[in-house]
Design a protein with these regions (language model features):
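Short amphipathic alpha-helices and their capping/turn segments at secondary-structure boundaries
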Residues: 2-13, 106-119, 161-169
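Context-gated lysine
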Residues: 8, 35-37, 49, 113, ...
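Short, small-residue-rich loop/turn micro-motifs
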Residues: 19-21, 125, 171
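Acidic/histidine-rich catalytic cores of soluble enzymes
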Residues: 51-152, 157
Length: 171
């Protein structure tokens, strides 16, 4: 396809895939607590579809990288664990420290569990005090962003020295 040719021509290291169907990421009227939740059967089917797509992308010479994300079906550490268990090794992972921490996950534990699948990293930090005061039954993802939930590494609460060292320890 023309899009795949463009990625290759630009020498992109991978295609980042972030789910947008049925998500509330761009809806300022949708509280964080209303995000789409997949049941076990839906997660199995989703994992299978993502694996097939990742295999196709790899066959085109362009690896995929799945991006877990706030306000999307795969947001939390537990949801990511279930997706990784229900998808094939052909589906690589984009590890996003900021989104995982925002979702309440243990970023170092996620790296330890899924390091073999990580092929791309986003290094955004979080402001823990902003996230802690959010009322997830009222605040949307965009409200959180506007309030300053995310920031650059070193300006927030995550220990990026530990994160980078942990990633580097796996190669």
């Amino acid at each position: 396809s023309a899009q795949m040719a463009l990625f290759k021509a630009m020498e992109a290291p991978c295609i980042v895939y972030g789910e947008t169907a049925g998500t509330i990421q761009g809806d300022r009227t949708a509280p964080l607590s209303t995000k789409l939740k997949l049941d076990a059967a839906q997660t199995r089917a989703y994992g299978h579809k993502l694996t097939v797509f990742a295999e196709w992308c790899a066959g085109q010479g362009m690896p995929l990288s799945y991006h877990h994300h706030m306000a999307a079906p795969i947001e939390t550490e537990a949801e990511l664990d279930v997706l990784m268990a229900n998808s094939g090794a052909a589906l690589p992972l984009l590890f996003d420290a900021g989104h995982m921490a925002f979702a309440g996950g243990d970023v170092l534990r996620v790296i330890d569990k899924h390091h073999a699948r990580i092929n791309h990293v986003h290094t955004k930090d979080i402001r823990g005090h902003v996230i802690a005061r959010l009322d997830r039954s009222k605040a949307s993802f965009l409200d959180a962003v506007i309030a300053g939930a995310f920031t650059v590494p070193g300006d927030g609460t995550l220990d990026f020295e530990a994160i980078v060292k942990r990633l580097a320890s796996y190669g």
